[in-house]
Swiss-Prot record:
Residues 242-262 have a biased composition (Pro residues). Residues 95-155, 277-300 have a biased composition (Low complexity). Residues 1-13 have a biased composition (Basic and acidic residues). PANTHER family: PROTEIN OF UNKNOWN FUNCTION DUF729, WH2 DOMAIN-CONTAINING PROTEIN. Residues 1-20, 91-193, 236-374 are annotated as: Disordered. Residues 166-193 have a biased composition (Polar residues). This is Uncharacterized protein DDB_G0286379.
Length: 374
């Protein structure tokens, strides 16, 4: 029986640049489309993935892909497909069938455990279940029962009218993307998937066509994405319940060294006045006979700077040395009769009496010159 494709499928089959965004070739585009769908159906996981852990949301996505153009068409197509199939996801028939199948399986398990005499009834029930599975496959419906997991969230049914896949879980239509009460129930690990790709794309030994393979690949990608989301939710719960790490014990940093002292270098001031103020000149002229006058207030006032002119004008008394100095700088010989004697007195008197004996009587003598010998 020829499969009838949806009217939107021509976007994937045209020979356009959109072929590189096909779902069975680029895993990054597939994850990107799933995140766009989750953004409308389950805001909690969408917010936590895009805000708290963007590395999960954008893993494997090529950063050069544009969010507009052909990738935008694919997003619109998947959104429209989910809206069109929402009535099938909410139909009570699917839920009733799932409930009946679950009840039959539970009854079979109870009969095997309690009554060994009902083996024939159990075999009949198992045969009926197998017949139902064969009939669903003949009607081009795919019921992929994942025996490694304990829930029915992995079951996908194939619709012959539009070529889409729908979820057969009993909860809300898009509850496959929601966070479960126990996140560890979803972490079944990707290792549970078949190791051989040919086994993953076969049902009862019959190979699937291209459209069915595409759906199977989409199912596997959804399973991986669901496990990654559950792992992130579980890690988030563990991190929130874990106590904060203790602060690292470390010694306080050593204090900074003190700044070096600021040394101010005072330059010596050799200020020499070119002249002396008029007050000093007048006082010096008036008191020329008494240079060391203590009543002169101008001279007794301390000068702020060293002035050579004041020193020269004041003519300080030099200290006399008791020893007579020779021109060479060596002390002269002391006189023998230092205190004086009678001979010296007589000699001095004779010299003073006869000093004018050889002088001319015409020549006048200056009294001032003789005063030195008197």
């Amino acid at each position: 029986m020829e499969t009838k494709y949806h009217e939107y499928d021509d976007v994937q089959t045209k020979d356009t640049p959109s072929n590189k965004y096909s779902l069975n070739e680029n895993r990054g585009d597939l994850i990107f489309l799933i995140m766009e769908i989750i953004g409308e159906s389950c805001n909690s996981i969408y917010d936590s993935f895009t805000l708290d852990a963007p590395q999960f949301a954008f893993r494997g996505i090529d950063k050069t892909l544009s969010k507009d153009g052909e990738i935008g068409k694919l997003i619109t197509i998947i959104k429209n497909l989910i809206k069109e199939q929402s009535y099938l996801l909410k139909s009570p028939m699917t839920n009733n069938n799932n409930n009946n199948n679950n009840n039959n399986n539970n009854n079979n398990n109870n009969n095997n455990n309690n009554n060994n005499n009902n083996n024939n009834n159990n075999n009949n029930n198992n045969n009926n279940n197998n017949n139902n599975n064969n009939n669903s496959y003949n009607n081009n419906n795919i019921n992929d029962n994942n025996n490694s997991s304990n829930n029915n969230n992995n079951n996908l049914e194939y619709n012959t009218k539009g070529g889409e896949y729908i979820s057969s879980n009993q909860s809300s239509p898009l509850s496959i993307y929601s966070t479960p009460p126990n996140p560890s129930s979803y972490v079944s690990s990707p290792l549970n998937q078949p190791a051989n790709n040919t086994e993953a794309f076969q049902i009862n030994g019959n190979e699937l066509d291209a459209a069915q393979i595409k759906i199977k690949q989409l199912e596997l990608e959804l399973q991986k994405f669901k496990e990654a989301g559950a792992l992130f939710a579980m890690n988030k719960i563990n991190n929130s319940s874990a106590p904060p790490p203790p602060p690292k014990a470390c010694a306080p940093p050593p204090p900074p060294p003190p700044p070096p002292p600021i040394t101010v270098v005072k330059q010596p001031s050799f200020l020499m006045k070119k002249g002396v103020n008029n007050n000093n000149n007048n006082n010096n002229n008036n008191n020329s006979s008494n240079t060391n006058d203590s009543n002169n207030t101008n001279n007794t006032k301390p000068q702020p700077t060293f002035n050579f002119a004041d020193v020269l004008l004041n003519r300080p008394q030099l200290k006399r040395v008791s020893k007579d100095r020779s021109p060479g700088g060596t002390p002269a010989k002391e006189p023998k009769n230092k205190s004086g004697s009678v001979e010296d007195a007589l000699l001095k008197a004779i010299v003073s009496k006869f000093k004018h004996a050889n002088s001319s009587p015409v020549k006048s003598h200056d009294d001032s010159s003789d005063s030195d010998f008197e």
